[in-house]
């Protein structure tokens, strides 16, 4: 995997930086693990925009990724190939189990075709293996961590993502996330050893607006150039400052304003990410 700067043959390619991985499969994905994916364009079931700046983009299938990895314990598996996934920043790996079944999983750092994997409490502590947190040594770097036993991985799934197992006490373990937050998770929750691969993803440079549109992201218009009917910062003659602290189109303070309100899970947070 390497960062490649393109030749300045056009303004769009002048600053473009790509992540090139020659180990990725160049053919079509594994068809039985593909599903149709219909465009939502940031709308809900009423057609109302719930997420702005979404729409368009290239058509692609959804790759069914196994985030649970809990029903193949003790069955050896082999990495058949690594693949690009347009639905996420991390790459995925197609693994074939000894019983012949194939599944997609998130590819960990250093994973290569032909690598042997194992799920379950008896699995060795080796990158790519998945096992309950109660069987993972304290201090181990982990990824794809469950928040509830059997629900599937929810923490540290993006490219280059990881967490660190800090301690175990009773039925709960403490995990430090990349944000600095220390969180309690049940020891029966499962995690994968190692870091998520494709760690250079954050260093790429898109290069041109069109490439962002291919990804289904639409332009972001500043509130200060809108009309007063459209945004609290809008209006004025000529170029005019916002005249107030930055807010969203609905008047909520933005740029650092904390909006988290989930008392149900407050007890699971040992240290907030803001107190690093």
UniProtKB/Swiss-Prot annotation:
Part of the 50S ribosomal subunit. Forms a bridge to the 30S subunit in the 70S ribosome. The keyword Ribosomal protein applies. It comes from the Bacteria. Residues 225-276 are annotated as: Disordered. Belongs to the universal ribosomal protein uL2 family. SMART domains: Ribosomal_L2, Ribosomal_L2_C. GO terms for biological process: cytoplasmic translation. One of the primary rRNA binding proteins. Required for association of the 30S and 50S subunits to form the 70S ribosome, for tRNA binding and peptide bond formation. It has been suggested to have peptidyltransferase activity; this is somewhat controversial. Makes several contacts with the 16S rRNA in the 70S ribosome. GO terms for cellular component: large ribosomal subunit. Keywords: Ribonucleoprotein, Ribosomal protein, RNA-binding, rRNA-binding. The lineage of its organism: Bacteria, Pseudomonadati, Pseudomonadota, Betaproteobacteria, Burkholderiales. It holds the Pfam family Ribosomal_L2_C. GO terms for molecular function: rRNA binding; structural constituent of ribosome; transferase activity. This is Large ribosomal subunit protein uL2. HAMAP family: Ribosomal_uL2_B (MF_01320_B). InterPro entries: NA-bd_OB-fold (IPR012340), Rib_uL2_dom2 (IPR014722), Ribosomal_uL2 (IPR002171), Ribosomal_uL2_bac/org-type (IPR005880), Ribosomal_uL2_C (IPR022669), Ribosomal_uL2_CS (IPR022671), Ribosomal_uL2_dom3 (IPR014726), Ribosomal_uL2_RNA-bd_dom (IPR022666). PANTHER family: LARGE RIBOSOMAL SUBUNIT PROTEIN UL2M, RIBOSOMAL PROTEIN L2.
């Amino acid at each position: 995997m390497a960062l490649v700067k393109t030749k300045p043959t056009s303004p769009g390619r002048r600053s473009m930086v790509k992540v090139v991985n020659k180990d990725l499969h160049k053919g079509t994905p594994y068809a039985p693990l593909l599903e149709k994916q219909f465009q939502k364009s940031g709308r809900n079931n009423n057609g109302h925009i719930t997420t702005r700046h979404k729409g368009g983009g290239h058509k692609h299938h959804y790759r069914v990724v196994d985030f649970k990895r809990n029903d193949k314990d003790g069955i050896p598996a082999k990495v058949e190939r690594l693949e690009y996934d347009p639905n996420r920043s991390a790459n995925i790996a197609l693994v074939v189990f000894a019983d012949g079944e194939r599944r997609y999983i998130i590819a960990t750092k250093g994973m290569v075709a032909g690598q042997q994997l194992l799920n379950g409490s008896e699995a060795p502590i080796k990158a790519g293996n998945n096992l309950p947190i109660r069987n993972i040594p304290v201090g181990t770097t982990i990824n794809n961590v469950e928040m509830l036993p059997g629900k599937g991985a929810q923490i540290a799934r993006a490219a280059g993502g990881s967490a660190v197992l800090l301690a175990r006490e009773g039925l709960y373990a403490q995990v430090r996330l990349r944000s600095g937050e220390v969180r309690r998770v049940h020891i029966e929750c499962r995690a994968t050893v190692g870091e998520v691969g494709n760690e250079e993803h954050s260093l790429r440079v898109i290069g041109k607006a069109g490439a962002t549109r291919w990804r289904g992201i639409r332009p972001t218009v500043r509130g200060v150039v809108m009309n007063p009917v459209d945004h609290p910062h809008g209006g004025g003659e000529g170029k005019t400052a916002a005249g107030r602290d930055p807010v969203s189109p609905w008047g909520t303070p933005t740029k650092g304003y904390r909006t988290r309100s989930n008392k149900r899970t407050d007890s699971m947070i040992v240290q907030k990410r803001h107190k690093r």
